[in-house]
């Protein structure tokens, strides 16, 4: 690996006995307890305004095309924590919580939370500061974590960039805190990306001079206070690649928690270096080949397999990347395909891959909204069904992942071995030698079937269980495993010893 280790020689020797690819930790935040603790989390991302209302309504109108506040609140989230925890999630990621511009713009209202006006005030549409504290407290009572989305790149203005009234902002209330107005025109020019503005002249996004010490000092004091006041466990940073990289080291130190930066780029050579400045980044390099593989039955697994290898080579710590197949910026997977087998494979792959899994609210109900704003539906209109097949799948996959972590606290530090990658099937193996989980994914589709055999680290004749069907199998005498795929379903095999007395599949 290309980065330093904080493990002793003895520890390295021991780790090599139990894992084919032990993770080597960097000297800085990747090895800190704040970041390391997030490896074992499974995150449920939600849009606060669209998840749950205080009145508990399951019929309140919410037309996504109107781009208005629909009434979701912090209290609504609290009231539905059983629903989230029932899927096995251990953390939630909520929308930015600070005060937004109040205008009805050409793109609607700031219900999403990315159009800041005052970083010291809470968005009253979501509730009060006490409501947010209560949400944090209720999560921690359940041993769950709170991740809050934040924006450090820009504020917002209803209108042209040339007409911004900076005095309306708090605390950055002078033009001198912001870059001169210019829209981004060249995403291959990093200076243009960092110093010019996102947005347009309908809603302009005044770009902060985060490279200036006065701006960074204010943000550092603010984030330390935010984390302390609301007992926040992690932060997701919007538009991270648009902020000067020198801003992040002191900000990471001031925050003192896991930082997940949105680096909206599919090239690992561009995305991975951001781990030099913050704990983790959203895994867009994996997202694109994952989407292309699981959105239909025509693509082979070659591109996805190659990206897994590239991430291992280019990233400092793949176990701190945030993996996703849907989010608030991308069309939902069911907008590309209605094949439930493909969707289930994508969900299971996302949850079992190396890194921190993130599921976007509504995936468990099969929501199919395409681009923003259609992918920001009101979840209450689903009735919060717990009988949906996707809800049950997510629960089952999180359950085996959580069991693996319970049995071996180092499980999430191991890198997966690709046991098989050919045609339309990929098999991954992860964990210590005596507790390895083998996951088999495909894009054969609901009418597809195939039988594959590949080598594993299982002992000859070892009893294994597909935790998604509860069917028992045995490793072959030569330690290979024969897997029969029917109906294009994913398979996740665990040694019977791993799930003993867990309740999984009645063991």
From Swiss-Prot:
Gene3D superfamilies: Glycosidases (3.20.20.80), Golgi alpha-mannosidase II (2.60.40.1180). One of its GO terms (molecular function) is calcium ion binding. Its EC number is 3.2.1.1. This is Alpha-amylase 2. Ca(2+) 1 binds at residues 153, 194, 207, 242. Binds 2 calcium ions per subunit. Calcium is inhibitory at high concentrations. GO terms for biological process: carbohydrate catabolic process. Keywords: Calcium, Carbohydrate metabolism, Disulfide bond, Glycoprotein, Glycosidase, Hydrolase, Metal-binding, Signal. Glycans are attached at residue 229. Residues 1-20 form the signal peptide. It comes from the Eukaryota. Substrate binds at residues 115, 154, 236, 241-242, 266, 329, 376. The active site is at residues 238, 262. It comes from Schwanniomyces occidentalis (Yeast). The record marks 329 as: Transition state stabilizer. Ca(2+) 2 binds at residues 238, 262. Pfam families: A_amylase_dom_C, Alpha-amylase. Disulfide bonds join 62-70, 182-196, 272-315, 470-505. Its cofactor is Ca(2+). Belongs to the glycosyl hydrolase 13 family. It catalyses: Endohydrolysis of (1->4)-alpha-D-glucosidic linkages in polysaccharides containing three or more (1->4)-alpha-linked D-glucose units. The lineage of its organism: Eukaryota, Fungi, Dikarya, Ascomycota, Saccharomycotina.
